[in-house]
Design a protein with these regions (language model features):
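Polar/acidic, low-complexity leader/linker segments enriched in S/T/G and N/D
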Residues: 1-58, 190-203, 213
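Residue microenvironments linked to proteolytic maturation
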Residues: 10-19, 24-26, 61, 79-182
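Short glycine-rich, polar/acidic loop-and-turn segments at beta strand-coil junctions
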Residues: 29-33, 64-68, 95-97
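Solvent-exposed, flexible loop/coil residues
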Residues: 36-42, 48-49, 54, 58, ...
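Short conserved beta-strand and strand-loop elements enriched in small hydrophobics
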Residues: 58-70, 116
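Catalytic zinc-binding patch centered on the HExxH motif and its immediate surroundings
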Residues: 73
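Charged/polar low-complexity intrinsically disordered segments, enriched in acidic residues
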Residues: 164-218
Length: 218
């Protein structure tokens, strides 16, 4: 199966702040249960979406504008601390005593930088297409790569390094069609003895086995 591509989301928050006494930048890189319109669909992040990636002690970086050369901290060294709270993904960056670190602290204090973003891969998601023209994607589990104070927001429709919202929706709907194709024979087998349509759990299991088969054959 192809590896999931990186996606980016940005939240503008008044609470992104610089704590002068210990040179720390504090803010939420993600907010739970906030519906964001991405153009082709709406999206929200479920509480607990970051729980596994944090428990796995992934070496997450703190960057400026998602640039690898603009490193501000990392969890491995203890200069970046991440935790889920009632609001979302809280980040605390112990800013470096460098030109970038000092300048960024000044910009945050002045209010010139007031947004934070995060880079991730979607691991588990749910879709609600009760309104096909306005579907909702819920991120249930993500793999976190970096958090970043940003100058400009990075959304899938505007950032060329991320999957577009249109492609994400198309991939989801293609997956649904694949699932339907796999379970059609199952439905036919059951129809002779049982008129009950297989539930989503059955469909998902059938799709998982078929994908495993394709991986082995590939």
């Amino acid at each position: 199966m192809p590896k999931a591509e990186l996606e980016y989301r940005t939240f503008g928050l008044d609470e992104v702040r610089a704590v002068a006494d210990n040179n720390t930048l504090v803010g939420h890189a993600a907010v739970f249960n906030t519906l964001v319109d991405l153009g082709y669909f709406r999206e929200l992040i479920a509480p607990g979406a970051f729980a596994k990636t944090l428990a796995d002690h992934a070496d997450v970086k703190a960057l400026f504008n998602h640039e690898a050369n603009n490193i501000l901290g990392r969890t491995k060294s203890g200069t970046l601390k991440l935790a889920e709270d009632a609001t979302g993904l809280l980040s605390e960056i112990n800013m470096p005593d460098t030109n970038l670190g000092r300048d960024l602290m000044v910009s945050v204090k002045r209010g010139d930088i007031d947004q934070m973003s995060f880079a991730f891969q979607a691991i588990q998601e749910e879709w609600n297409e009760s309104d096909p023209n306005n579907p909702i994607r819920t991120l249930k589990e993500v793999k976190l790569f970096d958090v970043s104070p940003v100058t400009y927001p990075a959304y899938p429709t505007t950032d060329v390094s991320a999957k577009s919202a249109e492609n994400i929706l198309a991939e989801h709907r293609s997956s649904i069609k694949f699932t339907q194709k796999v379970i059609e024979p199952i439905q036919e087998d059951h129809s002779a003895t049982d008129s009950t349509t297989p539930d989503y759990a059955t469909a998902n299991e059938a799709r998982r086995k078929e994908l495993e088969r394709l991986d082995i054959e590939g």
